[in-house]
Amino acid sequence: MPQIQPSEVQTFASIKVVGVGGAGGSAINRMKDAGLTGVQFIAMNTDAQALHNSKADIKIHLGRDATNGLGAGADPTVGEAAANESRDEIREALEGADMVFVTIGAGGGTGSGAGYVVAEVARELGILVVGVATRPFSFEGEKRRVNADWAISHLGREVDTLITIPNDRLLQTIDRRTPLLETFKIADDVLRQGVQGISELITEHGLINLDFADVKAIMSNAGSALMGIGRASGDDRAVQAAQQAIESPLIEVSIDGAKGVLFNVTGGYDMSMAEIQEAAEIITSAVSPNANIIFGATLKPEMEDELVITVIATGFDSDTFRQQEVSLTVGDDTKPAEAEVDDEMVKNIDLELDKEESAESFAAEPETNIWENPTVEADDDEDDTPAFLRRRKKNKE
């Protein structure tokens, strides 16, 4: 009987998750807290203090000379310059990966400016690159919207698949009384859910296992993608979760135009094959009969009487998202807006930080559920003071 040598056994795909900037770094911390395994976490930031508090496996301080460790000041051009300054460090950290996620919160400085540079380096190394970006809330202002359009446009050019999460649509899923700071944390956690839903298809043992080649078939050179998340328990939980996922407020257009669909069903040991079939039938009936559909089922012992379904739809026609674009197309080289931090802005943020320090802590849930008025752990760490406030304080001293 022939013996299989160690060199003949296929190794697991190397997956690296890169959080660029504040929101990307927060998403990494949430993934670590949620127990996501089988991937390497890399935090990249211009803010040295944020990196100090990061739970990432590897931390890269972008642009030491360009920023002196005090952040990009909400200016994407500073983030871009910082990433180019640290290009060799980025390359070294990404080498050897089969798949890289680049997560950013578009609209600020570091994530907006540095995100596409990180993706560009990964593509140069021949790595499958998936971008996951959040669009800012409308109330964050016109400058952040312009910065976000610029960032998402540039990131989209450098990744195989780009998943864009519109934060405004999160407002349809949470209680109106949810505090502002908690709302931002919920937005960060959706980044986590997107990355985790895809990576666990490869890294976690399940009832139905997929390998890297399956995921690559859907996500390689796929362009813009949509993500939906559904969560349900009790009777008909599979049907309810599947319907929530494909009708998710996070999905800006109908998924019936998708040429590729990847979805993951996650549940406890009480999850049955019949439930997986029910979910699959609902999702497949919502897309074209010619779509390439790949799905998996992941087992998590801690999940009792609950199913979570993550759907990624890819391969849309180029004009599918045209009506969703506000003022910037992919080919537009419009420069991002330069940041202006005035005394009123500082006063308002100081007020919000004071409120956060005096507020009662929220109970943390292992999985944030954006469908049931989620609660997110409040962070009372004084080290979370924004970088531009630290610069302002330093200048006064």
Regions found by a protein language model. Give the residues of each.
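Tubulin/FtsZ superfamily GTPase core signature
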Residues: 1-397
